[in-house]
Amino acid sequence: MPEGIAEGIGASVRRKEDKKYTTGKGRYTDDINRAGQLYAFFMRSNVAHATIKKIDVSKALTCDGVAAIYTGDDIAADGVGGPICGWTPTNRDGSAPKEPPHPLLAHSKVRYVGDHIAVVIAESLEQARSAAEKITIDLNVLPPVVDLSTAIGNTQIHDEMDDNVYFDWELGDESATASALESAAKIVELTVTNNRVIPNAMEPRAAVAEYDETNESYTLYTTSQNPHLTRLVMAAFMMQIPESKLHVVAPDVGGGFGSKIYIYPEEAVCTWATKKLRRPIKWTADRSEAFLGDAHGRDHVNKVKIGLDQDNKIVGLRVDTLANLGAYLSAFSMVTPTYLHGTLLSGCYNIPAIYTNVKGVCTTTVNVDAYRGAGRPEATYLLERTMDYAARQVGMDPAEFRRINFIPKDAFPYQTAVALQYDVGDYEAPLDRALEMINYKGFEKRRSEAAQRGKYRGIGLSSYIEACGIAPSAVVGALGGRVGLYESAVVRVDPTGTVSVFTGTHSHGQGHDTTFAQIVAEKLGIPIGNVDIVHGDTDRIPFGMGTYGSRSLAVGGTAISKALDKVIEKGKIIAAHMLEAADADLEFKDGKFTVAGTDKEKSFGEIALSAYVPHNFPHDRLEPGLEETAFYDPLNFTYPSGTHIAEVEIDPATGVVELVDWACCDDFGNLINPMIVEGQVHGGIAQGVGQALLENAHYDENGQLLTASYMDYCMPRADDFPALKVDYTVTACTHNDLGVKGCGEAGAIASPPALINAVVDALSPLGVTDMSMPASPEKVWRAIHDAQTKAAE
């Protein structure tokens, strides 16, 4: 970097975007208003399962301000389709999975509480809401299907599925795994449940749709993590219009966590209706709608069997999973419990034989799809709970049990038994650092001191690995993916040397305006204040796949790096011409093009100006201008890893679990901005702690969501956390230019098993060996009470 500039790779630069957000200058979808806009309100089902006999909207149509009311019949008459699944794994018998249609408005049947029945469009939201109360609907109520354990073969939900099973998938060698388990010296079995949670992004979903009669095109402002995918699917597969006729803008977005990747009925209905009414239409979810309509996460039941040899080395692992996918499929709902879950079952461990069978189950509940981590947290939770449980069964320290089963650092690249090949890793280094940070050796003294105060103290570990930067596209396609998983970037240098980067990723809390600018600063030697990052507008950015799966830096950042390399190479040719030197003699460093071994030089700004004022320019070799495009399709996943350790105290009188200490050491490869990385780790831990201790989406036997507001759905607050100790080790990714791996989901992946393992450890003197999430005060108190009662018998 030039002297005085310290804003490149590795610098903890303050986020450029924060001033806008902290001063109220953010522009979210609900801030957008169009002249003459109407407001949409969706009437939703209040029963979980029923056929629709009749919908009468006649009285509602007479209400003040009502412009139109549409039902599923209107949508069907126009031939508008519903959302589609983006990745379809093959069943173990070779057949295709079941993909029942997802109507935008229920056409003949409702399948969960919150299912869309009709949309009322009026001059104001209050008028639309009031008119909806005048709609009458005649339903034939059917038995709901809520319990995952009894859903298969229960009351039929879709005509296309007589058994309520979307797919029956497998991965691994069943015969080899059976043989390994049969010959094992010890068998450990555990049923592990991953509870259902609700994403709860700070900003609810919203949409503003507008039709332009002049050029017969649509504009949709929406809360999307992936505007190009929204445009592609909505235009080509749902509305059957040319993709170029739909302009999608995702402005500032207040969090996503996966739930804003997908296309929901509301955005599509508003877009369809705006042409019919020739007026803009606005819809913003309230928080109750978010609970009832946004895709939920997790909800797996796993039966785990692990085999050990005489030295307590793992010889085989079998996992049978039931995955609740809810009433309809969405973008990643089928891949989350299959390829994003089953392929991670080796974890950090050398496991010669692995087999998993996953059944995706339909229930009369809200759709379940990818939520921060997307399959990786589910795999890590079942594996790390089982590792802790097995260590206790064989009488080993949990840390040492993990250590003896780690893949050695000299074994890379390492081919797992479940398809993935890890390029690089060192799992002992973060384990050792985390143990040091938490003072693991001094824990028993702290446990004894807590006991003197009448508290139970426990410590729990989680050593995880995740797969990020999903790719390559050819492999994804062969496995049922319906999109490419590359990323794109355009780097445009202005005549004065400032730079605009147009990226196919999307930033909704990750800090791309800063980290991407740091890559530019590092490569070109310019201040980050001279770099503008553009994203979220399909008319401005190149086609890209958005942000999810910790892919933005590993894939999108590498695309930017490659485009910058092209800019530099063109700049060298221009500089060589101006300096009358050979191309091979040109060097570029710290924002200057120099001729090797001489004092001849041109600044980056001078070369930029020459590209646009090409008086002294190599016209025979180059076109004027300085703008380059790159698409990057990775050769492999990236594999972040690490160890998180939680320490808790439990009050036996109340069952309250207090998180008293946390230490983690992660390997994310090279860090672009350590401060932003730490913030991402903190956020992930908070969400994982929420799931482990507090959060749970609970349905009653009638399919009513009992936790449909913050009165009943508990989330963590700042005072629930100690000061989090965060550190890193580095093994750089071997196959991208930046050596980065991704960091956004690690905390949410590692934290739930660490915390539950700590709770179980705290209660282990009572004989407690397992605890399901969330470890609520009531559940913990009952475990203590039951153990004490049993001991007294």
Regions found by a protein language model. Name each.
Residues 1-164, 187-190, 266, 276, ...:
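Flexible, low-hydrophobicity surface segments
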